[in-house]
Structures are given as C-alpha cells and as structure tokens.
C-alpha cells in the first residue's frame, strides 16, 4: 500500500535498509525521551524555578513550557531532539499521504481529505518547532501562538486521520489495521478530553489561584503530550513489513 516497498530480497545495490515501523516509532521516541528527561531534571534540580506561579501559590509540577524551555540543560536537549526528529517526521507524513492514496475508497471527498491530512500533519510539525525554538521566557506571544496553532492542527490531524480510516473501513481489515484504528480513536478521544480539561483547570487557576490547581493543570498537560506521541506511534501497526531503503541508481525500486 505504501510506495516504500520491501523487495523479496535485499539486492547488492541496496545501501541502507531499515524497517519503516522502526524508523517511524524511533522518530517519536526522540521527543518522548527529551520530554521525560526535562520533567525529571526540572523536578530534581530546578524545582523552585520551574514550579513558580504568578500568584505564588504552592505548585508541585512544572508546566510543559517551564520544563522544556525555562532552564538549561533541559532547553538544549529538547531543542536538539525536536530538531533531529523533525525532518524524519515530514518523511513519515509523506509516507502516510502515499499510504492513504494507495487505499481504495469510493467517497468523492477522500482524495481531498488525504491532502488536507498531510497539510495538517505538516503544520503540526512546523508549529511544534516554533513553540520549541521560541520559549515562553524569550517571546511569550510567539510561543503562545505556536502552542495554540500546534494544538489546533494536531486535533485536526487526529480527527481527519480517524475519518480517513472510517471511510476506508479499516475496522474490517487486517488485525493490525483494526488494532491501529481502535487505538487511534481511543487516543484522539483521550487527547481531546485532556485538552479540554486542562483549559478548564487553567482558567480555574487564573481566577482563584488555589494551591495545587496548577499542579493538576501541569499533569493534564503531560497527558496531552503523551497521548499525542502515542497517537503517532500507531504507525507501528500501519506500515507492517515496509522498509525504508536507500539504493544505488541501478536498483529499480520505488
């Protein structure tokens, strides 16, 4: 289904061959590692700096913005991992576009939705880079724009992805396709629920400044981030035995 195909055997002209599932999931693991490192390091070594609130009420967890962009070395590692994972993410986005285009569907809107899905995915990656490289302490308004745009495009991407899978009746496909579709729906629902809950808690914190409320907000932020990463990790089921291959010009592979 994907035009990054695995040949029956690896010829002598194949220079590099990597399972595409490994490639796609490893790409997501870079920001996952950086995210967990930033949270743990902030709690251990920059607790007071990263948990301070504007109204000085007790708080026990750093927000995502404070953890990844407030202090060093967290900011350096986060930017490094996001930078390293960005180009491969665009390649995965292109692979998904070809994947969907290669899936039969009679719905007349399906081809257009495939391209919209690719655009949403690309914008999600772009605005993730924007909010990463412009921290809230450097330029709060630009960072805020990056964050809000990232959330908008990531929600749109998840919704359109689930719509595409429903259009192509993936629930009646292979076991891997059924598993992937089921997890995509669960993770999208969880992501949306946690995002809406975090907005409510954030407004609650700004209105009343009660102890521990910002801690709850930060925890909900963590769940939002982790569910987003988990959604992208469903690529493990989507690409099966496909391989990413670099071949010499004489090797006629797509």
From Swiss-Prot:
Job of this protein: Involved in the fatty acid remodeling steps of GPI-anchor maturation where the unsaturated acyl chain at sn-2 of inositol phosphate is replaced by a saturated stearoyl chain. May catalyze the second step of the fatty acid remodeling, by reacylating a lyso-GPI intermediate at sn-2 of inositol phosphate by a saturated chain. The fatty acid remodeling steps is critical for the integration of GPI-APs into lipid rafts.
Organism: Xenopus laevis (African clawed frog)
Lumenal face of the membrane: 46-113, 166-186, 232-254
Family note: Belongs to the PGAP2 family.
Positions of transmembrane segments: 25-45, 114-134, 145-165, 187-207, 211-231
This protein's name: Acyltransferase PGAP2
Domain of life: Eukaryota
EC id: 2.3.-.-
Source species taxonomy: Eukaryota, Metazoa, Chordata, Craniata, Vertebrata
InterPro entries for the chain: Frag1/DRAM/Sfk1, PGAP2
């Amino acid at each position: 289904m994907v035009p990054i195909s695995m040949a029956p055997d690896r010829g002598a002209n194949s220079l590099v061959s990597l399972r595409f599932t490994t490639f796609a999931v490893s790409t997501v693991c870079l920001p996952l590692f950086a995210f967990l490192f930033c949270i743990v390091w902030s709690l251990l070594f920059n607790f007071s700096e990263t948990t301070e609130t504007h109204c000085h009420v007790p708080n026990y967890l750093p927000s995502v913005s404070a953890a990844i962009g407030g202090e060093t070395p967290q900011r350096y590692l986060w930017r490094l991992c996001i930078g390293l994972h960005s180009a491969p993410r665009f390649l995965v986005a292109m692979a998904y576009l070809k994947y969907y285009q290669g899936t039969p569907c009679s719905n007349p809107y399906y081809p257009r939705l495939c391209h919209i899905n690719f655009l949403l995915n690309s914008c999600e990656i772009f605005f993730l880079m924007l909010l990463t490289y412009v921290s809230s302490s450097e330029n709060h308004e630009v960072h805020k724009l990056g964050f809000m745009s990232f959330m908008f495009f990531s929600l749109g991407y998840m919704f359109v992805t689930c719509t595409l899978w429903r259009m192509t009746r993936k629930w009646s496909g292979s076991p891997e396709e059924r598993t992937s579709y089921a997890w995509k729906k669960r993770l999208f629902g969880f992501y949306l629920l946690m995002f809406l809950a975090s907005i409510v808690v954030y407004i609650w914190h700004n209105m009343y400044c009660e102890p521990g409320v910002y801690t709850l907000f930060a925890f909900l932020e963590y769940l939002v981030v982790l569910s987003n990463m988990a959604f992208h990790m469903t690529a493990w089921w989507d690409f099966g035995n496909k391989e990413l291959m670099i071949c010499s010009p004489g090797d006629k592979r797509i």
